[in-house]
């Protein structure tokens, strides 16, 4: 009897241990890993601007830490306005900036989606509320400065549980469990992750290295170092964020500035993976939705009056000077590669991408089940369609020419230093204000003499008479 009683007690104890372990596992899953879907969006534009792409679990920052960082570390913010100082766009009444997603993965987290770089902003005058254009290039978004901000905050001694919880308490009353979780798990883990990210991005902070600045990143080096896991080299591939509206006009044409990727779905997927998304079945469906949305999203209409007669004259000039590369038609070079020897623009972005990078990236994409067409190494830049060209300033692949009028000038007469990132539009020159006093105060000083910033090349139309240039610019405003 005694032996049987001992055995029964042992079994009961084992069952209790299993129950307790299961309960603990459930609590741990619920508190840190459960995923709740976002509330449904009322529009496709809203889904594009704020919808999750699945980056919160691996790259998200806890919502309340995200909220308090600019208040805790104002000296690390480059200007007034909190996160707005980094050029992110914030719609009136919205909880987060455009391109920032909020999703519960155990607890509310904030991550990014494509809209953080691909939503344009413009004002027709300084006192006007900005107009936001989904899928346009955010020429003001200083992603590099934002990365540096998070890293600098994490390295600050005040990034600790006591100080952060005290700041959170000013805006939110956390439960006792959440306080414990933040104190002993979440805050230490976030600090560690941000410092690790700082180390991963140390290559962009080398002495004398050119800054990305607003509206740019170094896309192919990011692919080499993070997706392909290749060693850091000495290339500079800084490039402008492109417009991604109306993607159906690019069907069958190479993508990226250098034509290194064959399909729009591949470009969208690679970019989303770079933001920390995980290649789940849900993610693949979301990328399909995104591709469909962007395929049919029209380019924005020019917001200023247009001289119809002058634009009609300019259409003829365009047909003679530009259409062979930038308009569809028999024998058109639209969407094809223009060799660097012909186009003559800065080749640093081109040289940053290598055959080794393409091969390694293709292997990784295949392993992840998201290889929608092999990446390649090329030797030139793509002749792109010009729909909505008025809102794509500054111009060339590296954003080295401030406006279309300057692009029609010989290299020696193009602006050498200007200020980018200011969103008041300059209709006369077809671009943004880059030399006014407000532009100088708010903008980033761009010097074409820095490595990768060259404004040479693309000499088409530079020899046109002044009247034909004016007519051509009037027509380009209508595209």
Give the ranges of each region predicted by the language model.
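N-terminal Lys/Arg-rich, disordered targeting/topogenic segments
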Residues: 1-8
